[in-house]
Structure formats: structure tokens, C-alpha cells
């Protein structure tokens, strides 16, 4: 028994926390790297645990980058990113499930950057949540804003009424002080403060946060 979970023959990346019906069910990105073959393919994997010592793996068969999972009216929604090489371009993707084990991708919900507000390459890591203030869904994500300066790293923003059709909005957070996209953003309220958490891969790899009295 090990205190820390480690996948067999693979590396673990970008844990996506989730809690459902009394059970912790974090997802992670499984990457086989040198061990990749027909039987070992990269994918999102869900772990189930009640004590954070004993884990059961559930392969979702979803292939893609970091994202988030929410539950709406009994249906689970997964949002994640995928990467196109030629021409280089990233996409946001949507899948649904009734049990967190079997997922159905929705190809028609896939969408790329508008290439007006945001660059098409740095467009990933969607985090979706309900905005009480605006009565709609918000998606924040790692992005680079279009512009002449190189310091265009930001947390982007899209909004939706139905989780299927998204409107492009100006960045949620864009200090214009870093070239890198602000990765794996998370947003939550604690007490009277709203917190935005994200990671940076510039000259120093670090996790940072910003807080505000309003979203």
C-alpha cells in the first residue's frame, strides 16, 4: 500500500478534483509515453476513493487535455481540450455521462478560438461554473489575447445559457505582464472573497491566485 496513487506504466498529470455522493472521484490525465501501444493509450481516468489511500481506476476513454466536470439535472458534463497539429490549433470539447463511467462525446459542441479576441493555439484547460450574478454558465480557460505586445497571457472567458453554444467574451483576467497562457484556472467563492487560481510556466513555474470582492 502506498500513500500516493501512481498509475502503472504511466505518468499522472493535471488532477481534476470531483466529489459525488460521498465519494471523492478525482480525474487525471494518464500518459504512457514510452509505454504507449495499442493496449495502453493516453486518456482521462477517474479515480474513486473514500479514504485517499485505496483507489479504483475507471478509464473514461476520453482523449484530451485538462478540463472540468460538473453535474446538471442528473447529467454529468465534461469539458476538455484537444490539440490539432497541422495547422496548429486547439479546441474546447464537450462530453456527457449518466454515471461518470461511460462518456459520450458531442462533436457538434467542439469549438475553437474566435481568432479575434484570442489566439488559436493557446486555447485550453476549460473550467465551467454557474454564475449566479449573470444567470448563465461561464467557461474560463488558459489563453493568449490577440495583440501586438508579446505579454498577452490571460485567463479567457466564454458564456453560455445551455452548455452547448458559447459566446466569446473579453478575458476574465488579463494583466498583460506575462507571455504565457495562465494554465488550469479555477474559480470559487470562499466567505466574502472570490478566488481565481492558475499556474504559470514562465521563468518560474508557480501557482498563483488573485482575489476580489466581486467576480
Roles of regions detected by a PLM:
Residues 1-125, 129-182, 189-215:
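Beta-rich carbohydrate-recognition and catalytic domains
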